[in-house]
Amino acid sequence: MVLSEIFRGNNEVREAARAGMQIDTVSVASASDAASAADGSGKITGAIRPSAVAGSFYPADRTALKQLINQQLDYGRKLLQQLEPTLPAGVPRAVIVPHAGYIYSGTAAALAYALLERGRGSVTRAVIVGPTHRVAVRGVACSTAAAFETPLGTVPVDIAAERKALGLSVNEPLRSGTHARPGAPAPAMIVNGPTHAQEHAVEVQIPFLQTVLGPDLTIVPLNAGDATPQEGGCGHFLGDNHAAIPWL
């Protein structure tokens, strides 16, 4: 099943998404497929979006953040061991997780991320689709940033994948106000830097993803407004290697 089929056929998932649940879609991509905002030297080329909620939604101190995440993941791993006989095999293609502060919902998120940890070494790109709390959008908005920064380090954005979804040329810059070209895979996608600047829903997922998927991670951060799954084009980012999608 593809993401759009699940949204069409699963009312519980649809209602959870409307209620503000964070949706994280993860695709398995090779290093060549998951082109990022890094140049040949591995350096980030472009603007880096700094952490907006470190120190409030999660610890700003790197050591304290790692300790908290590992504590929450350990709890999730223990629960998964008990559930192992009933779980599908393989790496999940998508998980639904909350986006509150870690002391409130981190343990619930950690259960999903402990399951996603199966993909460490094979999953190199995470597509993070979340709601907006500060700057509303119509459609699905990608960022103008080349990377997102957290206390655990800087994660490159897969700008090449965003350009493809928007129907842009290879070297066309991502400027706020840009809309998808006619016939683009994601017709409702736009570029909107301000909606990402202070938004926490996507950001709070990144430290967990850095921890469970490792240093080769790239991300596609998306803020979702009014758009159908088909218009948003999330399926475009999933690639050709499909697996079962458990929704948590």
Identify the function of each model-found stretch:
Residues 1-34:
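Generic low-complexity, intrinsically disordered segments
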Residues 12, 16, 32-35, 62-63, ...:
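Short linear sequence elements within intrinsically disordered, low-complexity coil regions
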Residues 42-248:
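Active-site histidine-anchored catalytic micro-motif
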